[in-house]
Amino acid sequence: MATQTAEESSRARPKKTGLGGLLKPLNSEYGKVAPGWGTTPLMGLAMALFAVFLSIILEIYNSSVLLDGISMN
């Protein structure tokens, strides 16, 4: 018969794909935490630089920074 019960279909193994095989190593370290601070200082530096970038963009948008030789309408 071509029909399956719910029990039989729940036992089916997931289909393996090429993309899944490539991504599996990325998920193998799930839940593990490296000891120490790791790359936290680098992330803090990146966040600080991004905050500076955003503040510069905001100041230019608000025309609170005088730009020599550039006329803004």
Curated annotation (Swiss-Prot):
Gene Ontology cellular component list: chloroplast thylakoid membrane; photosystem II
Membrane topology: Single-pass membrane protein
Keywords: Chloroplast, Membrane, Phosphoprotein, Photosynthesis, Photosystem II, Plastid, Thylakoid, Transmembrane, Transmembrane helix
Coiled coil segments of this chain: none
Annotated transmembrane regions: 41-61
Name of one Pfam family that matches: PsbH
One biological process term in Gene Ontology: photosynthesis
Repressor found in the keyword field: no
Phosphothreonine modified-residue sites: 3, 5
Top-level taxonomic group: Eukaryota
Signal peptide range: none
Protein family according to the UniProt entry: Belongs to the PsbH family.
Matching NCBIfam families: PRK02624.1
Subunit text: PSII is composed of 1 copy each of membrane proteins PsbA, PsbB, PsbC, PsbD, PsbE, PsbF, PsbH, PsbI, PsbJ, PsbK, PsbL, PsbM, PsbT, PsbX, PsbY, PsbZ, Psb30/Ycf12, at least 3 peripheral proteins of the oxygen-evolving complex and a large number of cofactors. It forms dimeric complexes.
Protein name: Photosystem II reaction center protein H
Organism: Oenothera argillicola (Appalachian evening primrose)
